[in-house]
Amino acid sequence: MQTLAQTLASSKINDSLAQLILTLADTSKDISLAVRHGALAGVLGATEQENVQGETQKKLDVITNDMLKDALTAAGGVRGLASEEEDFVVEVSEQGEFLVCFDPLDGSSNIDINSLVGTIFSVLPAPTGPLTEQSFLQSGRKQLAAGYVLYGPSTMLALTTGQGTQLFTLNPDTQEFLLTDAAMAISPDTGEFAINMSNQRFWEAPMQTYIADLLLGDIGPREKPFNMRWIAAMVGDVHRVLSRGGIFTYPADNKNPNKPYKLRLMYEANPMAFLVEQAGGKASNGYETILDITPSEIHQRVAVILGSANEVDTCLSYHGIDYREEPNID
């Protein structure tokens, strides 16, 4: 099996981007170890702090954020970074050629129950001139690389540099990421969906109708049964979609009119959309392809519908001209 370093060396990307990816991968090994130590190291539970989204930070949120910041600062090549756990963009090096956006520990609410968590990252080109928030506000089409590391029974890295989506598995004996799927491919059709059903009454009409039809199964208009899956960590749900197909969605809702969307564009939706598209799937916010959205700020949130291409198209058909109403939740 090829190692990650060997795979990157044989790809078309330049050496500096390859080195940055290796830095992210090496740091994820340390994060994996911290996650596995859990209660033994006293790192479970919450802090008394909130992040910029108003969410209570878990201890491991803060620890893993600092691990990535320190590694990216020491590595060189990074102009600046943006994180779910940082209020503002962080300047790293004036000579850096890359911007890195990341969610250091996606699904951190799962930590205390020993369930799936992961790290999500996105790499963008750094524009010339002073570093500001505006430097980061590039559409997902500009991404040079994206990926996630899933900390589960195995530690796995899903990666794309625009040449397909590849899966690597960490060998616990050698601490090397080994290529275990050279070309991940999402089946176009599926019988699985992932959604947080507790918000059903707050969704827009198109999504309510779409999910209701899935639940009717073979006695409804879809004429086949569907199973629901929900891990409560985007990284876990998207990994399942990449591995065996499916549709994952976190739609707009009016539960809190001031926060109609849950997932962050820059360091959750964009990297996952890049991975999914490179594996033959599709990703949308219901009305626009996610990778075509121009961000307005680094912590912008969006609705997300991604996965098996035909099923995403079917979901989007419910958002067509006969269904679409401008939401009252902007």
From Swiss-Prot:
Residues given in the record as Mg(2+) 1 binding sites: E84, D103, L105
Binding note for cofactor: Binds 2 magnesium ions per subunit.
Location(s), subcellular: Cytoplasm
Protein's recorded name: Fructose-1,6-bisphosphatase class 1
Pathway entry: Carbohydrate biosynthesis; gluconeogenesis
Molecular-function GO terms, alphabetical: fructose 1,6-bisphosphate 1-phosphatase activity; magnesium ion binding
GO cellular component: cytosol
Enzyme class, spelled out: hydrolase
Organism domain of life: Bacteria
Protein's gene: fbp
Species name: Shewanella denitrificans (strain OS217 / ATCC BAA-1090 / DSM 15013)
